[in-house]
Curated annotation (Swiss-Prot):
Acidic residues composition-biased segments: 166-176
Regions of compositional bias (Polar residues) in chain numbering: 180-191, 494-506, 538-557, 705-715, 724-734
Alphabetic keyword roster: Signal transduction inhibitor
Residue ranges of the region described as Disordered: 1-24, 162-236, 489-515, 538-734
InterPro entries, alphabetized: RGS (IPR016137), RGS10/12/14-like (IPR046995), RGS_sf (IPR036305), RGS_subdomain_2 (IPR044926)
Organism ancestry: Eukaryota, Metazoa, Ecdysozoa, Nematoda, Chromadorea
Name of the protein in question: Regulator of G-protein signaling rgs-6
Comp. bias (Low complexity): 8-24, 194-208, 642-694
UniProt-recorded Gene Ontology molecular function terms: GTPase activator activity
Positions of disulphide bridges: none
One Gene Ontology term from the biological process aspect of the record: negative regulation of signal transduction
Length: 734
């Protein structure tokens, strides 16, 4: 197989060396070894000389930036700089920055390398060590991509030929680089296999030739140099010429003197670099931008990295900020609050004209520049389009149509107040306080200001942490207070009602329930509960017991009821209505807790106990509580009138002599003891005991059946008769 290859190779003794396998592989691709090997090596030397020279590299780098693949060249140059660092700490820091920029998960400029190489680099970085050969394999792959893919496209696009250098110049460059000369063949598609084959000695080779390949390292073929023996040492393999750092020419303001600024940090953005330069020059970092001194165009600080400033003449110029209000087509000055307007904050250089600044915004909001007027906000003073924006600094402009301007003139008002409170603030402080995002559009940068409702809605998110927490706390407290005010109106049945003692209508309505939570008299009467006894019979013992618990405030409230009830006029009722049982009157008491009442099995009570209590309470000399009547309680006066009417209506059935004996036992005490009244008419005795106190006390009201009247024996003795009629039941705790 070496015969066909020998015809194309020069007759040298080296043809019998292990390089025959490499030459055979080259021949299998149909390429001559000597000529192509020499040409490929020379072209690669020329290419490496071009990318290492900043002047020669600038057009090629600009082409890569246009093709969005400049990260490959940046990575190659960064690795060259990484190899020159001897200090371990500095090399580790720089190596970490290279990894974060080109190989990390969220890297800004990822390079196109194979997965195995990327995995090997990641493992090396995670181990904490950054040897000098950390990125050698990746650098070789990127160099191969640049040489055989990007460089030919660059030559075809510019219609230029490859630069030519003499052999002495290339040799001098090889002497400077020492160890970065080209491999014997770059036409092989797998240089790693070729390097591995060269490192294995041939079986029939002399012993002297085994030592030379044994010193080969499993490095990319580009990194090996078979020319010199001393170039095979690891230290000499990594020796290269220092790469010149990136730099730019900077001019300040309108000055013509320039200074060279080194672009040392490749990860820095244009915005950050501009702010640092402004701080160094004593300028306002928030009101400055960098422009190209040759073209006068503004460099986008948000989208471009610091590599875009390399080898360029730059100028650092101040900018001015102002607000423009755009009125929509349906805006009317008669009702300005009905239609919201668009507020835009603009940053531009002082020398730009107002028309040039507004032109891209008018196209953005579909406004015709020919039929629009520019006036100062709140006035009728027009601003010419040729006026420089530096003259309208810190002011607000309004853009409106011709028809709106005519309506504004016809309105007769020379000045109008600002429609948005933010218009009264300084434009320079608006985006500093609210951190609005700016967008670059040519030579201007702008941000759309949200309306007042949106700003107030998200106000707690636009301030710092303590202010946001304080506003959130106030907002929570306001909601809590609103809930408390609404919930405070709801009163459960178990809560005492403070207005129960002052409202006569509530007490007379019959639906008021006491504080104990028991059912009212009206609810029990509506449910059809059977109440035994007479409607005019009241348990005197329980009334006297509960009346002892009446406090002084209850006595004071009683005077109000006394004055009201005395003035109330009772309409005269007919004889039939008077004879009917008054079951609609509902006894009502104060909110004092009722006391339990012991009852006999037959429902009656002993006569000694109420008399004894009445005797005890009668020792005091308080006034007799006569004349105090509550509209919801049967009084003795109503009972007397009913008894007299009944006696006069039936003279035939009554005895010849009607004796009415009224026996009243009144005892006075500090708690107003009850009054007992007994009425006897025509052999029928009706006993009614009513409890009258300073405040309506808890009353146990008992009713008997309307069909059968109660006899005196049933009331006093409690024996005989129908047990249903003689039984007493508790009516209600009212």
């Amino acid at each position: 197989m070496s015969t066909p290859c020998s015809g194309n190779e020069p007759a040298t003794p080296t043809n019998t060396s292990p390089n025959n396998e490499t030459s055979n592989s080259c021949l299998s691709m149909g390429v001559g070894v000597a000529s192509n090997e020499t040409n490929s090596s020379r072209e690669l030397k020329i290419f490496k000389k071009v990318i290492r020279d900043p002047v020669l590299r600038a057009p090629f780098q600009e082409f890569l930036e246009q093709q969005f693949c400049a990260e490959n060249l940046n990575f190659y140059l960064a690795v060259e700089q990484f190899k020159e660092i001897q200090d371990f700490q500095e090399r580790s820091s720089f190596g970490r920055r290279i990894f974060d920029r080109y190989f990390a998960m969220n890297s800004t400029e990822p390079v196109n390398i194979d997965n195995s190489t990327s995995k090997r680099i990641r493992e090396t970085v995670e181990s904490g060590g950054f040897p000098l050969d950390t990125y050698d394999v990746a650098q070789y792959q990127i160099l191969h991509l640049l040489k055989y893919d990007c460089w030919p496209r660059f030559l075809r696009s510019t219609n230029n030929s490859q630069p030519s250098f003499t052999d002495e110049e290339l040799a001098a460059d090889d002497e400077d680089k020492n160890g970065h000369s080209q491999p014997t063949s770059l036409n092989n598609t797998n240089e790693f296999e070729a390097a591995a084959q060269q490192s294995q000695p041939a079986p029939n080779a002399p012993a002297a030739t085994k030592e030379k390949p044994s010193k080969q390292y499993s490095m990319p073929a580009e990194m090996t140099s078979p020319v010199k023996k001393n170039s095979l040492s690891p230290t000499h393999l990594r020796r290269c010429r220092p790469v010149e750092p990136k730099h730019c020419q900077l001019m300040i303001g309108d000055q013509f003197n320039t200074e060279t600024v080194t672009l040392s940090d490749p990860t820095m953005s244009v915005r950050r670099w501009t702010q640092e330069m402004a701080d160094a020059q004593g300028m306002d970092r928030m009101h400055v931008e960098v422009v190209d001194a040759e073209t006068g165009s503004t460099i986008d600080p948000a989208r471009q990295a610091i590599d875009a400033l390399q080898s360029r003449a730059l100028r650092l110029v101040p900018v001015v900020s102002f607000i423009i209000e755009f009125l929509p087509a349906n805006f009317s000055f008669k009702n300005p609050a009905s239609t919201p307007t668009k507020l835009v904050c603009i940053r531009a250089r002082h020398s730009l004209s107002t028309g040039a600044v507004l032109r891209p915004l008018l196209h953005k909001y579909t406004l015709d520049p020919q039929v629009t007027r520019i006036v100062l906000n709140g006035s009728l003073e027009q601003v010419k389009r040729s006026c420089a924006v530096g003259q309208v600094s810190q002011k607000c402009l309004t853009v409106m149509s011709e028809a709106q301007y005519s309506d504004r003139v016809n309105a007769g008002k020379v000045s109008l107040p600002p429609r948005d409170p933010i218009l009264s603030q300084l434009p320079s402080t608006i985006y500093e306080q609210n951190n609005f995002p700016f967008h670059q559009n040519g030579d201007i940068s702008y941000c759309e200001i949200p309306n007042e409702s949106e700003r107030n809605k998200h106000a707690h998110l636009q301030h710092d942490g303590p202010n946001a927490a304080h506003q959130q706390k106030e907002y929570t407290l306001s909601i809590f207070n609103k809930f408390v005010r609404k919930a405070s109106h709801a009163v459960s049945k178990s809560d005492p009602n403070p207005s129960a003692g002052t409202s006569q209508d509530r007490m007379a309505s019959g639906v008021y329930s006491p504080a104990t939570g028991g059912p009212s008299f009206a609810s029990r009467a509506a449910a059809g509960t059977n109440f035994g006894g007479s409607a005019n019979q009241v348990n005197a013992g329980s009334a006297s017991t509960s009346s002892n618990n009446v406090s002084e405030p209850s006595k004071n409230r009683l005077s109000i009821f006394k004055s009201k009830t005395e003035k109330k006029v009772v309409k005269p009722e007919s004889e039939k209505e008077k004879l009917k049982p008054r079951s609609d009157d509902i006894p009502t008491t104060s909110t004092s807790t009722p006391m339990a009442v012991e009852t006999k099995p037959n429902g009656s009570r002993t006569t000694e106990e109420p008399l004894k209590r009445m005797g005890k309470s009668g020792d005091d000399g308080s006034q007799e509580p006569q004349g105090i009547r509550h509209p919801a309680i049967f009084s003795t006066k109503i009972g007397d009138e009913a008894a007299a009417a009944a006696a006069g209506a039936s003279p035939s059935t009554s005895a010849p002599s009607t004796s009415t004996s009224v026996q009243t036992k009144t005892t006075t005490s500090p708690t107003k003891s009850p009054t007992s009244t007994t009425i006897t008419t025509s052999g029928t005795t009706t006993s009614a005991t009513s409890s009258v106190a300073t405040a309506p006390p808890p009353v146990l009201h008992a009713m008997r059946s309307a069909s059968t009247p109660a006899t005196s024996s049933q009331l006093t003795g409690g024996g005989g008769g129908n047990p249903r009629e003689s039984s007493w039941q508790t009516a209600a705790y009212v």
